[in-house]
Regions:
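Flexible phosphate-sensing "switch/lid" loops adjacent to ATP/NTP-binding sites
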Residues: 1-236, 241, 258-261, 284, ...
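Catalytic nucleophile serine of serine hydrolases
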Residues: 246
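A conserved active-site-flanking secondary-structure segment within enzyme catalytic domains
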Residues: 253-308
Length: 402
């Protein structure tokens, strides 16, 4: 196992587990600098832990759970997932395995993803409070809300298998990232969004998408070995719209080089797919920026995007020769901008172009406002969390009264 480590936006390397644990204390000054910068700007900072604070083999020099809470003197809420089962053992065991100092830092426990009548849970909650000596700060129900998943935890990859009026195939790269870029397409009534990892499943989609990846060179190698690269190039030559985002865009170019081994791959250079102009060179500094503007210079089927506004963000290693919000060559397109499909006008315009090419009515796809939908989902989540938590206790914890 290894971890990609970044400090102040610069790559520190792909560190094997033992080397990371040996060096992690070196990163504390950067962690504290980031925290202090945030504390000057915000009244409340929420720190999400990583993994479990009960992993006692990792507690020495910890910088992501209780260790960080100690460094910044933060009170702690311990959250357990009851949907996976064994939540009382999780919460009690986690508290029991803490040092006496860290036990005092835990100000409340929360049961998350509860299904059913809370009254059934009450006897267990009372026993948990007695055993842990920590109040139960709330029970949050299991919610059917549609919010973004973590790349490694998504259950969406199996959805939308049956082609509909417009069929979009996203290549499921082994190290796929930012796949939620394409979520807006899922909500049109007659659009199917499929994740494909085998040539036989590609079929004949209206649009092929190459998504972002945590390792462009390695995933391009996989794409080549799997036969999907050849299948995509054949589809592109037949007129299928191909769209690459971030790492997917880099793959579509002529060449990729990594002289500093930023991606820590055995291969430091590789020929791209050659469907877009330009080359990409990886370098130590990571691009992280928000971006917005108006499309211009777009050619081919998606030339109808010219004059339309876009907004999103870039987060990537490597710089490409060809720059601009959207690079095009025939029916092949590439962009570094994540969130480019969140703008309804952009998504509608692309789907209209696909419908026109196919000779079907755009109205048959249905109408969908992605931004309004996302706001409703987060409002539902916020309302349920607020209703499930003892907010008086939460505010007392924030005010250091507990």
């Amino acid at each position: 196992a290894a971890s990609d480590v970044y400090k102040r936006q610069r790559v520190q390397g792909n560190l094997p587990a033992m080397e990371y644990y040996r060096r992690k204390c070196d990163f504390i000054p950067a962690v504290m600098e980031a925290y202090e910068s945030l504390s000057r700007e915000y009244d409340v900072i929420v720190i999400e832990g990583a993994g479990s604070p009960a992993e006692i083999n990792l507690q020495e020099n910890d910088i992501v759970n209780m260790g960080l809470a100690r460094m910044v003197d933060a009170p702690v809420l311990l959250v357990g997932d009851i949907d996976r089962g064994g939540v009382f053992a999780q919460l009690y065991g986690t508290v029991a395995l803490q040092s006496e100092e860290d036990k005092k830092r835990i100000k409340g426990v929360v049961v998350n993803k509860f299904r059913g009548d809370r009254a059934i849970l009450e006897p267990g909650l009372k026993m948990l409070e007695q055993l842990c000596g920590v109040p139960v700060a709330g029970v949050v129900p299991y919610l059917s809300v549609d919010i973004d998943d973590e790349d490694s935890l998504s259950e969406r990859f199996g959805r939308g298998r049956e082609p509909r009026l417009i069929d979009i195939a996203v290549i499921r790269l082994p190290r796929i990232s930012n796949f939620t870029d394409f979520s807006p397409f899922e909500h049109y009534a007659n659009v199917s969004l499929r994740y494909v990892e085998r040539v036989r499943d590609l079929r004949a989609p209206d649009m092929i998408v190459l998504p972002g990846t945590k390792s462009t060179i390695a995933d391009l190698g996989w794409l080549r070995q799997s036969g999907l690269e050849a299948a995509i190039k054949k589809a592109a030559s037949g007129g299928t719209l191909v769209f690459g985002v971030c790492g997917g865009y880099q793959m579509l170019g002529r060449h990729i080089s990594d002289p500093e081994q930023v991606e820590a791959a055995c291969v430091t250079e590789i020929d791209g797919m050659g469907l877009l102009p330009g080359e990409t060179v990886f370098e130590g500094a990571k691009v992280q920026t928000q971006t917005s503007g108006v499309f211009s210079g777009v050619e081919g089927l998606l030339s109808v995007l010219n004059g339309k506004r876009y907004a999103g963000y870039e987060i990537h290693m490597g710089r490409s020769e060809a720059r601009g919000a959207l690079i095009s060559a025939g029916n092949v397109y590439g962009s570094y901008v994540h969130g480019i499909f969140d703008e309804q006008e952009v998504t509608d315009t692309i789907l209209k172009a696909l419908c026109e090419k196919r000779g079907v009515s755009f109205k048959a796809l249905g109408n969908f406002d992605w931004k309004a939908y996302k706001e409703r989902q987060y409002d539902l989540l916020a309302d349920a969390v607020r209703a499930g938590l003892d907010m008086k206790l939460i505010y007392r914890i924030l005010e250091r009264e507990v």
